[in-house]
Amino acid sequence: MKLQLAIDLLDKEEAAKLAQEVEEYVDIVEIGTPIVINEGLPAVELLSKSISKAQVLADLKIMDAADYEVSQAVKFGADITTILGVAEDASIKAAIEEAHKHNKELLVDLIAVQDIEKRAKELDEMGACLLYT
C-alpha cells in the first residue's frame, strides 16, 4: 500500500513547499486537477523539481488525446498520470503505452464508471495496473 497526498487548492509554489515538508512521510504527491487548471503543467514541473523521494502524480483526468497528454505530463516530470475510466478503450490503451514507453505509470480513475467490477476487468486486460475509485 502507498500513501498519497492530494494537493488541490494551493498555488504551485505553496504546493511545492507543502510537498517538501511531507515527502518523507508519503509515497506519492498529487498535483490535483484544480492546480493544473489554474497553473498548467509547470505546476507539475515545479513539484517534480522540489521533491526527490516521493512520486509525482499529475491528476489530469485525461479523456482523449491520451498519448499526447501523457507525453506532456511526463515531459514536465510526472511519474504517474491519470485518465478517466470512462474514456474510450483506444485512449486508455494509448495512454498506457505512452506511460510505459517512458517507464512511468498510468492511474485509471473510475469516477462515473457504472459497473466498476466489469470495467476493472477490461482495464486489467488492457494492461492498466493502477485503478482508483
Task: Write out the residue ranges for each language-model feature.
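Glycine/small-residue-rich loop that forms an oxyanion/phosphate-binding "nest" at active or ligand-binding sites
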Residues: L47-A95
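Structural motif
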Residues: E24, F76, M126-G127
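Conserved small/polar residues in nucleotide/adenosyl-binding loops
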Residues: Y132-T133
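Receiver (REC) domain switch/active-site residues of two-component response regulators
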Residues: D27, D79, C129
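Generic structural signal for hydrophobic
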Residues: E21-V22, L47, A73, A99, ...
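Active-site glycine- and acidic-residue-rich loops that bind
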Residues: V108-I116
